[in-house]
Amino acid sequence: MEVDPQLRILLKPILEWLDDPRTEEVAINRPGEAFVRQAGAFLKFPLPVSYDDLEDIAILAGALRKQDVGPRNPLCATELPDGERLQICLPPTVPSGTVSLTIRRPSSRVSSLKEVSSRYDAPRWNQWKERKKRHDQHDEAILRYYDNGDLEAFLHACVVGRLTMLLCGPTGSGKTTMSKTLINAIPPQERLITIEDTLELVIPHENHVRLLYSKNGAGLGAVTAEHLLQASLRMRPDRILLGEIRDDAAWAYLSEVVSGHPGSISTIHGANPVQGFKKLFSLVKSSAQGASLEDRTLIDMLATAVDVIVPFRAHGDIYEVGEIWLAADARRRGETIGDLLNQQ
């Protein structure tokens, strides 16, 4: 692989991290700062690089794999000269003036099987039969908040417990306002990736990346919500937050949670949990991927993807939270989320 000397010069400010065997990831979300993951946690550091430097790194790194990176091709998964995996996101998939570079450093050492017990924490490796008991215990914990009637404590437990939440209601009902409140309750050390078609969410967390997709796949560098989801999975997120669910974003929403990233907070139009879930089912079913699935299969997938549906409506300048559907409550009543399709 022929490497442009300029690329190595541009990478010099981050080489001390890439050369450190403790480093797992280097996340550059915008000019001037980097988040370095070591020992399972990200730490923030100043980084003396400009927007132009980051853009040049992206273009030159893409060229290593003969990929043309720029406004018309703003997403790229490639490698750096020494084998580190790199996910590139340029405008217009990120806000103007920012560049997202996520560098995953490969392990320099291959351990033997004899070292597995010392390198991996696996206290439950042979306890598959206990999964239902643990699931029931998790349900009991959230149901205590639900049954006690303390709405603030319940919502906080949903957020920190990484339940996947769907907020539904008509336009102007307060669902987007509540989504901002709930996002603010996410532990501040988490790395968040948002996927939106317009910048509506407010993200107070330092380590975050705002990804933007084009409505109906139009515009320069047209990418879909699903394209951004695939990119975000290579960016070491703690949570992926999809804004409003509509059109092709519905399949991305389902794929996100099924891929092992619970704790999303998203909004959808629908007057109540029944209508909100029917809308989600219809949108997923209307996607190219969802159309090929049997209804039963799709319902089973959605059952694993949605933990809470919170409805909203407005009375003048007063917002009202309606009857919340909770998967744990449905399970103790012997119901599933699929039963919502048969309700009015």
Swiss-Prot record:
Subcellular locations according to the entry: Cytoplasm
InterPro entries to which the protein is assigned, alphabetical: P-loop_NTPase (IPR027417), T2SS/T4SS_dom (IPR001482), T4SS_GSP_E_ATPase (IPR050921), VirB11 (IPR014155)
Residues at which ATP binds: G169, P170, T171, G172, S173, G174, K175, T176
PROSITE patterns hit by this protein: T2SP_E
Molecular-function GO term, any one: ATP binding
Signal peptide coordinates: none
Top-level lineage group: Bacteria
Pfam entry (one): T2SSE
NCBIfam families on file: PRK13851.1, VirB11
Lineage: Bacteria, Pseudomonadati, Pseudomonadota, Alphaproteobacteria, Hyphomicrobiales
Protein name: Protein VirB11
Gene: virB11
Disulfide bonds: none
Family membership noted in the UniProt record: Belongs to the GSP E family.
Alphabetical list of CDD domains matching this protein: VirB11-like_ATPase
Principal subcellular localization: cytoplasm
Alphabetically ordered keywords of this record: ATP-binding, Crown gall tumor, Cytoplasm, Nucleotide-binding, Phosphoprotein, Plasmid, Transport
